[in-house]
């Protein structure tokens, strides 16, 4: 079989996995409502909240993370004896870069791959990123160009301990935008297609991401929590802080995590109880609903605040333990009942 044929097979296999109960090979196909994401990337914190209003956020902070434990099962690492695996590059955000990455995953899954490259119209790539095509303006083209550049600068390096041998590749090998043809061409490294083949893949619902527009901390925690197995063990506050990879004071980071978890509860994605065991705080996840629940009547919107810079640092009185509440029965209200409920809320707010 030709080299191109082998590469195409690798790409098809990247979006397939075997049902452990039936043995049937199931192909995971991304669409506008969901995307296939390798769990390793979701748990590592590759895409994190980025406060762009600060000088450091605008400049583009460089980060490096140890991915040895998550990526050591790659056949490349096993065959060559690579033990030290790192991902390095510009800090990638949730608001732009994650959407662009979603578009990249969609492109390789839904369009013909020639060798290791896929080419598609720019407007189609915008649609695969989950962005309305009506917004495909010059400003959007510049934004996506910057995002593709940031993703392409992120490298995955494989090194052997006690040896000078190493291999360096990119999350996206090359990304090219042709103004003449108005197309986007993406090239990936076939040696790391196996990254998508991990038995720990997850089909992320994008509905929650869209509901959490501009709430990057909540978006990042959603991608992490959704990648966990059924009935996950309690998640420590420290682990969620690490997933967000923020740089503010610990007490401010704790407040950011709590705010993000509450936002996930507000959109109907999950319910949880916060408990304290010794000196550590944990979140017990009761359920997860990627498709969310019916929207509740809107309440008076509070002004938005930056995710990882909160007013005041003297927040020592943050509650560490949230008492468990009994989950009430959910009912659908008629338009008349919703109108009455809204009037009652407005009256209460005026008091």
Swiss-Prot record:
Segments for region (Disordered): 295-315
> Per the UniProt entry, what are the Gene Ontology biological process annotations, in alphabetical order?
DNA replication initiation; plasmid maintenance
Q: Name one GO molecular function term.
A: DNA binding
Its signal peptide is none
Q: Does the keyword ATP-binding apply?
A: no
The record's InterPro entries line, in alphabetical order, gives: Initiator_Rep_WH1, WH-like_DNA-bd_sf
Q: Where is the composition biased (Acidic residues)?
A: 304-315
Q: Which UniProt keywords apply?
A: DNA replication, DNA-binding, Plasmid, Plasmid copy control
Q: Does the keyword Protease apply?
A: no
Membership in a protein family: Belongs to the initiator RepB protein family.
Report the protein's function: This protein is essential for plasmid replication; it is involved in copy control functions.
Q: Which protein, by its recorded name, is this? A: Replication protein RepA
- The record's gene field reads repA
